[in-house]
Amino acid sequence: MSAALPFDVPVTGQEIAWKPFANYQGFVYKILNVDVARRNVDMVLRFEPDSVCFYHRHWGPVASLVLEGEHHLQEVHADGSKVTKVRRQGEYTVSTGNHAHIEGGGPHGGTIFFSFRSDQDHIYDILDDKLAVVHEVTVQDFRDSLDNWSLDN
């Protein structure tokens, strides 16, 4: 049996120090790793059944892996058209992240690993229902949150 690496983090089960995301309901998250110099963020989100997060738009590629349940995604394109996708446990995808979308869990919820990459400090924008930017989220925001993770619990 190999020794655990210092960055090994379990992602399922009750032992996880999940956190709610601000005042949003229906999902919690755990930041796994932040590399400010490379502008990389790895995290896991756990959605309650049939819940969604908020509209947002990424500034770079996003890799996702459905660990448990389903990942439901509704993309909103520039022409206003919407495309709904359902990803099931074990599905891995890489997207450009360049269009607005909202995502959540399926009828039994969902636990999804995300890996964000960017060529700038800006990782994603939180959008309102009209897709206007409400807040810009940076790699440093993630770093600060991870650095203070145990202090907040």
Residue ranges and their predicted role:
Residues 1-39, 83-85, 128-153:
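A short, N-terminal "cap"/entry segment at the start of jelly-roll beta-barrel domains
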Residues 49, 58-78:
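Glycine- and acidic-residue-biased ligand/ion/polar-headgroup-sensing regions
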Residues 45, 54-57, 61-66, 84-85, ...:
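His/acidic/aromatic-lined binding-pocket segments of jelly-roll/cupin-type domains
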Residues 51-54, 72-73, 91-103, 120-122:
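Histidine-centered metal-chelating micro-motifs
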Residues 36, 77-106:
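Short acidic-glycine-tyrosine-enriched beta hairpin
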Residues 30-45, 112, 116:
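Short, contiguous, helix-prone interaction/anchoring segments in small proteins
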Residues 31-38, 49-61:
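Active-site region of the double-stranded beta-helix
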